Amino acid sequence: MAVETLRGGRDGGIASGVNDTSPVALPLPDPADVARRKKIMGVVFLTLFLDLLGFGVILPVQPFYAESFGASATVVTLIGASYSLMQFICAPLWGRLSDRVGRRPVILVSIAFACVGWLILGFAQALWMFVASRLIAGFGNANLGTVQAVVADVTAPKDRAKGMGMVGAAFGLGFLFGPIIGGVFGSRYGAHVPALIAAGLAALNWFAAYFLLPESHPAEKRTAAVVVDGHGPRRSIFPLQALKEALAMPSVAPLLVMGLVFGVGFSLMEAALSLFVERQFVLPPAFGTDAGHKEAAYLSMLVLVTVGVAAVIVQGGLIRPLRARFGERSLLLAGAILVAVGFAGTAALPFLSLPFAAMLALNVVVAAGSGVFSPSSSSLLSRSVPDDRQGAILGVGQSVASLARIIGPSMAGALLELHRSIPFALGAALLLVAAVLTRKVRDPEHV
């Protein structure tokens, strides 16, 4: 494999103490290696797209599916928190395991679990089956950190934000087309049908990954399962210990704290969105009926599609030039402020009697803010650790995001029952706190 840069330390610079200033010819990239990296990125995009397409399919109908089993708004959002609880527990496990055995087997096993979870959801006959399906799917879908580690494996640090932007674009496309499929089939044939479609997409995803995805993390770079040569700390796969280890790293801790605050605020919106739409825009006598649920699912689909379009535009095409011009720290600040503005506007809707189009416009602002914040945060996080810890640290990052999605939804339902604006108002306040915390973040290239 050709060497693209001269390496003299973690930052890739030439070792200090070398006084020879004569020009040095850098080896040209190996065309075969470049082609391999592009292939891996393409397969990762396909895998993520199918994964998020399946997840997006269920989004418009999931709250109303749970309500059909007698769940209240508080229970609906707690079920969402249980899904994130499994991701919090399992994301470091998947990430650390991928550092030890490779990315490919971890991705294949996790997709298989997700498929089983979606199947149980599709055939659920009681609320306990609904909850069990979300726990199993959460266990399987805790693999985002591993997928991000694949991106980190095959991209140079200077291109990391672009690679993470591709991850975001796959998210956007999944959230664009998934809710359309879920909204159409759910409104016609019932809420269980989108779950079965999600199971089929997970099965297709498994076969695509099995036949197309090569290993990106070679054996010589893998972390041993035991302490190397009897020295150094043992790296835990358990979330609290792994999080403790990550928080001890000065370059990582500010990113994780900021990400937690951002995630709690954002997840308040995610958990409350469909129920807010139902209470704000579905009027009596349809409200609370099957027809009202279908109308709310359709309107929620429109919001999610709008978010998906905006996310694809920002993360698929704008993130690289924005990073080059403003830098990732500036994008973190701008992203948090944009999301806060969108949330504050949404919280004001019940008091302003604005039409549904205002809800769509505000979510474009939210998607734009999240679209620059998330890939910038992931890029900074991945560049803050050595190559052999990419999977572990990105798994911890996903675990922190999952912890946020436990805290936020656990409050969202109860807050929404007090008043539908409260989750969005609190979310806006937390996003402003996250904006302030961006001042503590340091770019590894400039430390």
At which residue positions do the language-model features occur?
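Juxtamembrane intracellular "pre-TM" segments in multi-pass secondary transporters
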Residues: 23-37, 216-256
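Helix-breaking motifs and short loop linkers at transmembrane-helix boundaries and internal kinks
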Residues: 70, 102, 123-128, 349-353
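Conserved MFS/SLC helix-loop-helix module at the cytosolic interface between two early adjacent transmembrane helices
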Residues: 88-125
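Helix-to-loop junctions at the C-terminal end of transmembrane segments
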Residues: 91-101, 313-328, 416
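Structural signature of the two symmetry-related core transmembrane helices
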Residues: 105-120, 199, 330-345
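Cytoplasmic helix-loop-helix junction between adjacent transmembrane helices
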Residues: 133-172
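Helix-loop-helix hairpin linking two adjacent transmembrane segments in secondary transporters
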Residues: 167-211
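C-terminal transmembrane helical hairpin of 12-TM major facilitator-type secondary transporters
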Residues: 330-377
